[in-house]
């Protein structure tokens, strides 16, 4: 196998993984669970310090298994009943009794959450205080930086017990640094690599498909998927391929943001973006009668394409990543429909022309609306591309897909930092 292909597999396996709940509050739960494991006694106080962007993405989203919103309950639940070994599924086995105990800490004023200027968009430090049987106070502290589970330092009783070496478990945003990767290389890899090497990606279809079913069958969030289904049944809209994709994708996001106790297969630290990279591709695979192997290749194309595009700008920025994720999904949809590589590039260009610039104003139930908007753009871009229509040389969309991707990165890094600060100020007012 080519060295670059081995790197692609490593990248996918590093950042396409199951996650239970919105990954920003879950990062706090994970840090708290690791700290609790180290503490060795019952925690009686928590201090949580996070970056502005992690705070933004935790303000309005339900924490699975708790029925509650926010960083305080996420961290407290992680400290009381989290499983540090489970990573982003840290709260999978949380019990009602443990949630009640976590809430008691909050009600007693023993969970403090604050923001700080941080070196990375993803930053979380959790410090626990506890008392042993003799009444002696102990402390444990865990710091995450650059990734939702990337521990850079641990302390026990104020003594450093672990420090990540430089480059160890590198920050998520740098994951493609030094890797020979491009849209053309991704397309070649996805279509030519041995099927057995990528069979694992089919778990994305299974996990995110179950979330979609959950959102269709039960009331979560804004019920966008269920509302579309009701409108189809009422004859107000038809169940064509676009509406089915939007409905199924939004339903999965409804369930995720509404606190469903089911994991999503995430992408680049985002469950919604994992959903956006998966469900549209699965629906098109069903429409064209694709084989299991063809679906796996399309999912690899979609997920790795999304990772590559998103590596051009910081995670948790002011830019909603569902746009570029849906662009990668559109590329994969073209493949499933028998289109050419050139048409796949058209699809990416079309989607980025359609919806690039959508802002992120925090994780919340209405993220499902942005997911539905992006998935609709993916279908439009895909259908235009199948007819060999592609946007070129207009606005931020350049004459070739690689330059367009670089332009998006520049727009986010250089043009949207003030937007990000303004959004956080508005939300915190």
Swiss-Prot record:
HAMAP family: UPF0597. It comes from the Bacteria. One of its GO terms (molecular function) is L-cysteine desulfhydrase activity. It holds the Pfam family SDH_alpha. GO terms for biological process: L-cysteine catabolic process to pyruvate. InterPro entries: Ser_deHydtase-like_asu, UPF0597. Belongs to the UPF0597 family. This is UPF0597 protein AHA_1619.
